[in-house]
């Protein structure tokens, strides 16, 4: 609970010279007894199964916190989604946020820390869909045409830790003018490798075999990266203070775009009543 203090792990006290990490060595997958002191001084013990890796849990917490920040700052009008890579995990995360996001008035696409892969064409195809109309049935809700098309404006956030296919999708988002690109210049590493050769000791060699060319940048994405439309720095004190000026600027930009180009669902209360065709 908030305010509880961890004082012991497995019966051993946590202190200035004994960290929780030290007491959790070799405990992954095992049941571990944790003892907490509550704010009123009483003790509470729980048994948990220690994880091998907490990065997925920390990632989910970060994404959900960002989503909550966006939801509260926009009164529920804007959807936030993060794409961690351009492989299976990133493709799943994209659809987790995007399919629920097409009904919102605005969309923030977070490409920061994207480690690359190969599925950016599939994601760009979805982001580039323009809502042209609606399919309206007699009883059901109106469905956007084309399906899974974004209702309102989009903005994207990127940074210096987005690379490879993360570079490429940042570049294409900007090149196709899907919305403003906010943050810092990307990593600039679009030459791909292929781990095809295994060594006798179990190691693997890789060699550069792929690159990227576009009509706008030519070959210059490598070693240069993608310049954002709006540069916003993340300072060390921002990390320490839990402040995200890049996300704050993205929220401000998408709200501005929504004000200038307000998305609006047409009024379908009056359905067409066409007469029967005349004979002859």
Could you tell me what each predicted segment is?
Residues 2, 7-203, 238-243, 252-260, ...:
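Cleft-lining beta-strand/loop regions that shape enzyme active-site pockets
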């Amino acid at each position: 609970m908030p305010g509880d203090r961890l004082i012991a792990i497995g019966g051993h006290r946590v202190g200035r010279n004994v960290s929780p990490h030290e007491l959790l060595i070799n405990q992954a997958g095992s049941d571990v007894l944790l003892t907490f002191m509550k704010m009123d001084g009483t003790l509470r013990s729980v048994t948990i199964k220690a994880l091998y890796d907490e990065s997925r849990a920390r990632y989910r917490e970060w994404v959900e916190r960002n989503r909550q920040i966006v939801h509260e700052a926009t009164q529920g009008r804007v959807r936030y989604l993060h794409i961690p890579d351009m492989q299976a995990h990133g493709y799943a995360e994209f659809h987790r946020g995007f399919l629920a996001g097409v009904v919102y008035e605005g969309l923030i696409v977070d490409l920061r820390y994207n480690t690359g892969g190969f599925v950016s064409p599939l994601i760009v195809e979805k982001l580039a869909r323009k809502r042209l109309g609606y399919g309206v049935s007699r009883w059901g809700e109106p469905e956007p045409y084309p399906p899974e098309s974004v209702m309102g404006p989009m903005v994207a956030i990127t940074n210096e830790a987005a690379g490879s296919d993360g570079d490429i999708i940042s570049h294409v988002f900007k090149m196709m003018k899907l919305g403003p690109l906010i943050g810092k210049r990307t990593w600039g590493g679009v030459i791909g490798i292929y781990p095809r050769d295994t060594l006798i000791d179990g190691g693997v060699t890789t060699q550069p075999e792929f690159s990227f060319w576009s009509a706008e940048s030519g070959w210059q994405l490598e070693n240069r990266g993608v310049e954002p439309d709006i540069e916003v720095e993340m300072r060390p004190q921002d990390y320490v203070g839990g402040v995200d000026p890049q996300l704050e600027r993205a929220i401000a930009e998408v709200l501005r775009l929504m004000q200038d180009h307000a998305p609006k669902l047409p009024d379908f209360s009056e359905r067409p009543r066409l007469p029967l065709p005349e004979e002859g």
